[in-house]
């Protein structure tokens, strides 16, 4: 719901429907915003966002130490990286020269989609790993397109927005294997 060109309109509409029908503040009721990326919660839990560590921890010295000890990783990032919108602003300003996009379509899913597409043309190196051969981001000028497995070709777990973890087993062989 929220990662679309109309996301900023959809979410308040959902909230307003809940308010109008009295479905807020009662057990089992309330709005539940859906992300635009499968396993987005799983990515957050393992530290897949640039602005937080694993398990939704911030970058305080104590939290950095906790993650480093848990993972037995003496060298760990010590500060936030750029969020997606900030990253594309940095590309526009020439601060980022190379980008590797994996399994997402930021030329559609991010705010200011036209600015995102325009910034991609300023990269010296633009690599995409995806399971499709064409989408708006690829068509914006990817120089290298690498294959990636689709969800039915992967083995692992996914975590949905309510934090339910599901086992995922492949039911198709990846092309070329």
What are the functions of these language-model segments?
Residues 1-27, 32-177:
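Non-catalytic alpha/beta scaffold blocks inside enzyme catalytic domains
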């Amino acid at each position: 719901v929220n990662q679309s060109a109309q996301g900023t309109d959809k979410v308040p509409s959902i909230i307003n429907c809940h308010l109008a029908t009295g479905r807020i503040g009662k057990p089992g009721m309330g709005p539940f915003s859906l992300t635009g990326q499968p396993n987005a919660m799983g990515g957050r839990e393992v530290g897949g966002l640039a602005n937080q560590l694993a398990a939704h921890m911030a970058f305080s010295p104590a939290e950095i130490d906790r993650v480093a000890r848990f993972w037995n990783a003496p060298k760990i990032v010590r500060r936030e990286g750029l969020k997606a919108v900030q990253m594309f602003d940095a590309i526009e300003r020439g601060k980022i020269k190379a980008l590797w996009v994996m399994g997402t379509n930021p030329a559609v899913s991010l705010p200011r989609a036209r600015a995102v597409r325009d910034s991609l043309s300023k990269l010296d190196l633009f690599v995409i790993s995806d399971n499709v051969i064409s989408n708006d981001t690829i068509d914006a000028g990817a120089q290298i397109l690498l294959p990636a497995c689709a969800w039915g070709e992967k083995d692992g777990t996914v975590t949905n927005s309510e934090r339910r973890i599901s086992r995922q087993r492949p039911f198709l062989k990846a092309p070329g294997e």
